[in-house]
Amino acid sequence: MAALLWGAPLTAQAQCRLALVLALDVSASVDAEEYDLQRLGLAAALDAPDVRDAILRGQNGSVALAVFEWSGRFQQDLHLDWTLLQSHADIDRAVLALGNISRSFEGYPTSVGQALGYAASLLKRGPACDRRVIDMSGDGINNYGYGPAEAYRHFPLRDVQVNGLVILGDDAEVEAFYRREVIRGPGAFVELSAGFEGFRAAMTRKLFREINDMMLGHADAPRLSPHG
């Protein structure tokens, strides 16, 4: 699928506080129903009022977003190229695009290291922002190709925060794998989803936290409303 670029154009003058890459697992363990829950859950999370408010409320620049799907060694597909989210209309277009994407790959293994490498390449050519974050979502451990450790050695990820959204299911080791090998950087965290059914709520929590990360811990930090 061709990458989509909407929203405000990325210019050298545009002030950006956060460059956020969302990496979605579409490996063989994700069936068609689970894929739809993930796809629609992401769109709904980005559309959540609290997340919208967090994106648009920032006083120190905009949020830039890129989204890709990943699976095996050579299976990475960009669905939303770098887009500045500076208005509700920008967010509306991104939500519409993400809600209507088609699955890129089926039946391939789980290559977390390669996905991190691809995310690093996106950040390298992306906007210059105050913070750079990769949001890795997955339901399994690395089972093909090089792992996260090799990716961190060979790609320019030194100043990048990598967080994880773990989809709990049949693989009992996936949470420990993400905590031990995937997340990286000061303040990095793992968000848990109770199966794919919980993906929407987990992604909403995760986006809200990542976008507000510079304020968390302060007395006046924003809080996610009970309904997201």
Predicted feature descriptions by range:
Residues M1-A8:
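Bacterial N-terminal signal peptides
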Residues E106-L157, F208, G228:
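Exposed acidic/Ser/Thr-rich ligand/metal-binding surfaces
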Residues Q15-D81, L85, A89-R132, I134-S137, N163-V174, ...:
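Von Willebrand factor
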Residues A23-E33, L65, D81-L84, L98-P109, ...:
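Second-shell loop/turn segments in exported
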Residues I55, G140-E181:
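VWA/integrin I-like adhesion module and closely mimicked acidic/polar interface patches used
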Residues G58-L98, V174-E181:
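Short beta-strand-loop
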Residues A172-G217:
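Von Willebrand factor A/integrin I-like adhesion domains
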